[in-house]
Amino acid sequence: MNVLLIGTGGREHALAWKIAQSPSLDTFYATTGNPGIAKLAKPADITVTDHAAVVRFCQDNAIDLVVIGPEAPLVDGLGNSLRAASIAVFGPDKAAAQLEGSKGFTKDLCARYNIPTARYQRCRSAEEAKAALDNFSTPVVIKADGLAGGKGVIIAESRLEAEQAIQDMTAGAFGKAGLEIVVEEFMQGEEASFFAISDGETVRPFGTARDHKRVGDGDTGPNTGGMGAYSPATRLTADLEKRVMQEIVTPTVQAMKEQGMPFVGILYAGLMLTSEGPKLIEYNARLGDPECQVLMMRLESDILPLLYAAATGKLQAQPEPTFSKDYAVTVVIAAQGYPASPKKGGIITRLNEAEANGAVVFQAGTTLDNQTLKANGGRVLNVTAKAADFNAARDLAYQAVNVIDYPDGFWRGDIGL
């Protein structure tokens, strides 16, 4: 099978690492920009926003399957363009990607189909959002409706803080993403991430994880795209997983089909485990980053037949994905100044030495400059390890982190605690 992978982050490096292991793989191409992926796949020098160029590349190189990693191309409708050219795509089309692209769309869908989630109000102006605060106690959650790189959610401890967040969002702090706002009740409980793979009709569980969003130890500082993760999510028991499938995930897939926008790809449910049971915080229309990294470390099934079956409506014929009983832990090394203004250009060495204990270092915000590896983004490296015991996996990951020489980097010391 000839495969094209779209995306250049740590998530895509983990996907590439797993795809490259598949016996079903013939030729593997990936978009350029990640030195780690470049070791595994041939370069596809294409601009992802130029859909015609992507289609042409697929036709010229007899691509059997396109795997889209990040959310932006999904929401931009790249899947639609490829499907229109009869190219199999793993990832939803533009309409179905609204599950991530518009928080208001998802909340309305939940309300219509009785999918458990927090009480909310959609607001189309700062005035409307500020007035909506009268209907909520603090803390209250203020969300930008659109894509904001994992940073468009503010938990406001006071009304003043909530009004400031509303003001910032409507003034363009997250670009067009904040033109509409969702005001939401704050849910008490523990967070967990639940993943499912769907072909638009059939849906199967695809592992669980827990990520750490805040930049600092002890869950302090601003939200980020994620500073680390572990899998499985220990609080998600088999009974809870069954409830999540029955009460949240399966009804969503059925609802999307009924709405005429079948969801193909990975459905990532961000959950709050409340005293009343699991409730949906939000959906993502793709694998999480860095949750993908821990899931790929644990996935035992050959990934390509799964992705291709989902892309071609044949998931029913595939056996359930199997995951190792081992634990996996990812620690993100970020550039100083992240998330506000990460310092670029820092030199990174000793990655091979870091992997000597069995850890895998997935590259994210990196670039090669005359064979010297340098930081080129906020989240730079994702150091991932697996072991039969949770603490052993954690120790292996941190041992590898401490071997890497990257003076401009920092990380949280409490991932998994």
Curated annotation (Swiss-Prot):
Cofactor notes: Binds 1 Mg(2+) or Mn(2+) ion per subunit.
Chain residues that bind Mg(2+): E282, N284
Sorted UniProt keywords: ATP-binding, Ligase, Magnesium, Manganese, Metal-binding, Nucleotide-binding, Purine biosynthesis
Pathway stated in the Swiss-Prot or TrEMBL entry: Purine metabolism; IMP biosynthesis via de novo pathway; N(1)-(5-phospho-D-ribosyl)glycinamide from 5-phospho-alpha-D-ribose 1-diphosphate: step 2/2
Protein's name in the database: Phosphoribosylamine--glycine ligase
Organism name: Zymomonas mobilis subsp. mobilis (strain ATCC 31821 / ZM4 / CP4)
Family: Belongs to the GARS family.
Record-level Gene Ontology MF annotations: ATP binding; metal ion binding; phosphoribosylamine-glycine ligase activity
EC number from the UniProt entry: 6.3.4.13
Lineage, opening ranks: Bacteria, Pseudomonadati, Pseudomonadota, Alphaproteobacteria, Sphingomonadales
